[in-house]
Amino acid sequence: EVFNKFGEVYFSSTYPGVVKAWHKHKEMTLNYAVILGEIKFVLYDDRPNSPTKGNIQELFISPQNYILVTVPPLIWNGFKCIGTTESIIANCADVPHKANEINRMHPTDKSIPYDWGIELK
């Protein structure tokens, strides 16, 4: 079951070339879907005992390439608008927003080995 409970729904808008990253939630599970435009969505796992520690995953999402992305707590994530127009992302989270529940890093922070200017294949 994808949705275990309801906390809130919110929308995030971004424009061509703009990166919104990095952040991870301590408690919140995210359920992202792109409703307008094209997004490169990136996940990074730095959990100490995770079998996927150090892995990066890129997803290219749009209404034409629909993917519901579920991000569990403690996974770094972010996105970049890769289309030519505004993109809008919807998130159906399982807990309401709390400011002290989220960690943030700059998109170019070297703690995450990712370059937003390239695509991993």
What are these regions (language model features)?
Residues E1-L68, I82-K121:
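Non-catalytic, conserved peripheral segments adjacent to functional cores
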